[in-house]
UniProtKB/Swiss-Prot annotation:
It comes from Thiobacillus denitrificans (strain ATCC 25259 / T1). It comes from the Bacteria. This is LPS-assembly protein LptD. The lineage of its organism: Bacteria, Pseudomonadati, Pseudomonadota, Betaproteobacteria, Nitrosomonadales. Keywords: Cell outer membrane, Membrane, Signal. Residues 1-21 form the signal peptide.
Amino acid sequence: MSALPGFTLAALLLNVSLAEANGLVLKKDLELKGSTVAGKEAPLFLTADRIDSTAVGIIEAAGRVEARQAGRNFFADWLRYDTRENSVQARGKVRLEQPALLVTGDSLDIDLDTYSGQLAAPVYRFVGQPGRGDAERIDFIDENNFSLADATYTTCSVEDEDWYLKIADLDIDRGRDVGTAHHASLRFLGVPILYTPWMSFPLGDARKSGILAPTIGTTERSGLDIVVPYYLNLAPNYDATLYPRLLSKRGVQLGGEFRYLLEDARGVNRVEYLDDSEAARTRWSVALNNSYRLNANTQAGMLFDRVSDDDYFRDLSNLISITSLSHLNREVWVTTQHAHWNAELRAQSFQTLQDSTASTPIAEPYARLPHARLGAAQTFGRFEFTLESEATRFAHPTKTEGTRVLAYPTLRMPLVNDYGFLTPQIGWHSTYYALDESAADDNIVRNLPIFSLDSGVVFDRPMRFSGVDFEQTLEPRVYYVYAPYRDQDDIPIFDTGLLDFSYAQMFTPNQFIGGDRINDANQLTVAVTSRFVEAESGLERLQVTLGQRYYFTPQRVTLPGVDPRSDNTTDLLAAVSGQITRDWRIDTAWQFDTQNGTVIRQNLGASYRPGPGRAINFGYRFIDQTTEQVDVSAQWPLGRRWYGMFRYNYSFQDDKLVEGLAGLEYNGGCWALRTVFQRLATKEDQSTDALFFQLELNGMGRLGSNPLDVLKQSVPGYRPSNEILPTP
C-alpha cells in the first residue's frame, strides 16, 4: 500500500504475512502513539483492527479505530477518511478528545481543513474541572467556534443531577473565550427557578462584562433587600461594578465601584446614593482609597470616607465591623523610606458618627493639618542611634488648637549572646508647643532625659511528657526605666491616651500613647516566661507568663481628671496560651489587683477545631466596672450533609445581646443551601434583624442574599460546606 495524497499511515507496522483478501491487519507502534503535529496541515495518524482502501482516495477503518491530528483524537467503531476532501465520517461509539474537553456521540462528520461539521447526540465533559452535559447535536463552525442545540450543563454527578442549565442554543467562541446562551432556564430539583432569553459569559477565569448573580435578603430596618450588580470589564487592569439596590422600606439605592491597578498606582473608589423614603432625606456614602508610587522609595496616597448621616451604616449594613464604626478617616499622605532615614507628610481629619441613643456623645478627634514626621536609624559599632521627630498642627472646632514639635533621639548598646541580653538606652525627649490665644500659656517647652535598662536570660532543658519530647524554656526578664518629673498640667491633650496595661506595655518607657504626656518614672518590671516547644515539629504547645511592675516613687503626671497611682506595685499580669493539642488552642490573660485581691481584667479564649467544618469557639472578656461579655460560636455537622452555625455574644454589663446568629447549611454535593438569621445591636438601645437565604450552585454561581461575609466574621474557623465535601 502506498501513501495517499494528504494522508499518512504512521504509527503502524505492516505485518505482510497476515495480508489476505479481507484487507490488511495492522499493528500499533507504541512509541508513536499519541504523537501530534500542530496546525491544519498536520498528518492524520490512524490505527484500527482493520483498514481498507475501498476506492481512490477513500480509506475505511473498523474495530477500535483511533485517529489523531494536531491535538484532536477521534475514537469510533467505524471511520471513513476522504483524502481528496480531507474529511472524516465516524460512526458507533464516537469519542472526541481535546485538551480540555471530552465528547462522545453517535456519529461525527467533520471537514479537517475548516474544522466544520456535526456531532450527533453528544455527551460532553470538561477535563480538569467540574462540568458536563449533553445536547441534541454539536455544530462545528470553524477551529474556534461551535454551537450546541438543545443543550444542558451541570456540575452534578450523573447519579445526582439535582440542578442543570437547559439551553436552547449555546454558542462557544474560543477565540474570544466567550459563551452565549439563548433561552436558558435553570432547573433545581426539577423545578425551573430562573429564565433568561439571552446571556453571555466568559469561558474559564477570564473576566467579562455582564450581570452578576443577584442577592436577595431581608432586614428589619430596610425590608426586602435586592441587589442586581452589573460588572464592566473596562480593561485588563481596571473595571467597574454598578449595583442598584432595592430596599422595600426605603427606596432604590444606586451604587458604583471603580477599581484600577497600574504599574505605579492602584485604587478602589465607591459611591452610593439613596433617596430614603423611610428617613425622608437623601443619603449617600463616598469611599475613596488610592495610592501611588512616585519612585522606588516614595509613595503617596489619599483616603476619603464620608457618609451623609450618623446612622447610615447602622441602617444599611449587617456587618458588626461596619455598624460599630465611630470615626471615618480622611487623609492625604506622602512617605519616603531610605536605608537610614524615613519621612512622612500627612493631612488628616475625621467624621465622627454619633449614637443618638447613647448617654454620652463620642469625642471628636483632633484634625492634623498638617503632620510631618522624620525618623532616622544608624549603627556606630556596638551603638545604635535612633531619632523620632514630628511637627503637627492640631485643629478642632471647640477645643484648644495649636502646633506641637517633638524630637526624641536615643542611643542604645545591645549586648547579646546565646544565653541572654543586656540593653542600656538613654534618650532626650524635647517638645515645643505654640498654642492659640485661648490657652493659658501660648508657648510651652518640655525637656527630659529617659534612661532604661532591659535584660533577660534564657534557660532551656529537654523533657518528655506523654511519650513526646519537648524543650522547656525559662526566660526571666528585668526592665528598669527612669524619667524625671516635669510639670505638664498646662499642656492640652491633642492625641494622647493611657495605654492598656498589658505584658508588652510593661516593657515600654511611657505609659501614655501620643506626645502630650511623658510619665515620671522610677520603676522596675520583673517577668518570667516559660515555653514548652515540641522537639520534632517546633510547635509551641504552651506558653506561661507572669509579670509585675514595682514603683520606687509616687506618680505625679496624669491625664486631666485622672487620680495619680497610690500603690507601689502594679497589678499582677498572667497569661497562658498555646496549641495544647492538635485540635485545642487556648489564649487567656488576667490582670489581678494584689492589694485588694480582685480581678481587674480577664480574657479567656479557647477554640476546638478537629477538622474542616468543625469549629467551636469560646470567649469571655471582663474589665472591672466597664465590660463583661461572653462570646460563643460554632460550626458543626448535624448529619451526613447538614451543618449548623451559631454565635451568641452577650453583654452582662449592658444586659443586652451584642450579636446573635443561627444558621443551617446543606451540602448537596454539587450545590449548597444556606439560611442564616442574625440579630445585631446597632445602637445603645436598638438592634436590627437580618435573614439570609442563599443557594450556591458549584461552578455556576450563587442566588439569594450572601451570608458568607457574616459567617466568616462571626464564626472563626467557618468553612463553606461545599469546600469541605469534594464536588463529585
